[in-house]
Amino acid sequence: MRFEIPEQKKLTYEMRIPIHVVVGTSMGSLVGGSYAAGLTPEILEQRVTQVDWNVLFNDDPPRKDWPARRKQASENPTFDFTVGVRDGQLKLPKGAISGQQVQLFFNDLVKGAETVQRFDDLPIPFRAVATNLENGEMAVFDHGPLPVAMRASMSVPGLFAPMEWDDHIYVDGGLVRNLPIDVARRMGVDVIIAVNLGSGYLPRDQLGNILGVTGQMIAILTEQNVPVSLKQIDPKRDVLIVPDLGDITAGDFSRAPEAIATGVAAARKVAPQLAR
């Protein structure tokens, strides 16, 4: 997962190019779902760049609310990674974080649209793509609580605990469809404006822990399904935007402004295609 700010949406907004549907995978579901719910690119950019991601990625309450014993224990901190044995089996946590703070952020981000049950009833029809962890199949959310669909789509294995909803377990949609061209086609669109960020492989020095290894495995799976999607793009009518994010990686949330600027520059390069 890398930053995905709506580069093409920002430019199409300026050029007054109508957007009839939005489809998003992983961080793209956060961006796409927010845009479909009515947020302007400017407001979305402001929210994403100003939020404290360190707080979002911490399931703990503020330190001021800790009991005295825990505050004292924090003077000699240890790595909090719970491992245990139950019924003779090794038990590990489902993810580094449960994602409670992230879910609250999503709820607030699309406030006013979180009660819309059919995504076709949003200001712009929307689909979020996730992976069904039980059978490995692609899951396309077209209804339900919007923040839940967004959270399910970007439940990066190893980082976030899987999302359980409607009797199913979901993880990041990038595992099966990082560039959901076929989903957009099925919604009946004539022209697709796609943003392919790719996953990018982590350098060796970042593969020394479980999150690094998990991230690399996800990147490998993602890069295997993207070429299939790229073949579905019609160069005569569709527009493909490929920002060069350089060394900006999945965890560089503090570098969101750089990622946005790079994305906007890439979108402007294809402005003639967007205007045709």
Predicted segments with their positions:
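Patatin-like phospholipase
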Residues: M1-T25, G33-R276
